[in-house]
């Protein structure tokens, strides 16, 4: 009998009851649903690039790109087009069919939109799907990006509405929901998830998933991030989350949003192979691959492929994953810091 339910009216107590299930029961339920919709042995592969690093005016307490915290990160302007295209060609050669671009902004400026649209068009001309995360979007900006051919847009909710004020004060929860609404209305696909391990309670993890699952349409992709603690940020000394609670979050996300991609996102570099294996069984079916986070590297491509072989997993053919995570888009920023001579797009203000 099928356990799959596509609903948009989940109550908090229902979700908390799922979190409270014995682990074996929860994993059985999540994996059964996962198997109904997806090939459980295929994992979508994502490649991404930070196209503008640092100097963000927001105060997200987890983020080393905030200008408010001394994390040793050097700010950079928008990358030159040829630099972006070189990275995209490399990603395609490595097997990616979707290229993901992220900028550390509160929101893109209107004067940067022509350049961003050109970037979308030129990456698409390589035969790749495109995705971006640029901060908040107006309805007009979402329509412009959609008209340029952007396939996916990421904007995370981060946590529950109740805990949100302890994480961020410079934009509201409604700001985030409005951006998701603009993206969906434009015809682009929505990527939205959150970060766990930020000192939140279990009910906050349930609240985050409730918000995502009760959107008018489920996100096409749901990145679940484990906090990457970066020196200099307010969250650098938080206690580690019990890894099994992370697995529970993946499993409940799969149950609530059975047809969405559930992305095992930032924080994998600190996860054991055994923990990742449990996440794949619980319903995660996408990863970031070959990327480098600001402070620590993502698992090496060879390590990921070795893990795939040990688990009998294979990369999904013909579809690489999207950029759906503002924390994971911190990817590659550290690598760029060592390229002081790299060309930038001069017209864009920091």
From Swiss-Prot:
Domain of life: Bacteria
SMART domains tied to this protein: BATS, Elp3
Cofactor: [4Fe-4S] cluster; [2Fe-2S] cluster
InterPro entries found in the cross-reference section: Aldolase_TIM (IPR013785), BATS_dom (IPR010722), Biotin_synth/BioAB (IPR002684), Biotin_synthase (IPR024177), Elp3/MiaA/NifB-like_rSAM (IPR006638), rSAM (IPR007197)
Record key words, sorted: 2Fe-2S, 4Fe-4S, Biotin biosynthesis, Iron, Iron-sulfur, Metal-binding, S-adenosyl-L-methionine, Transferase
Catalytic activity: (4R,5S)-dethiobiotin + (sulfur carrier)-SH + 2 reduced [2Fe-2S]-[ferredoxin] + 2 S-adenosyl-L-methionine = (sulfur carrier)-H + biotin + 2 5'-deoxyadenosine + 2 L-methionine + 2 oxidized [2Fe-2S]-[ferredoxin]
One Pfam family matching this protein: BATS
Entry's family note: Belongs to the radical SAM superfamily. Biotin synthase family.
Function of the protein: Catalyzes the conversion of dethiobiotin (DTB) to biotin by the insertion of a sulfur atom into dethiobiotin via a radical-based mechanism.
Full protein name: Biotin synthase
Protein species of origin: Shewanella sp. (strain ANA-3)
Gene name of the encoded protein: bioB
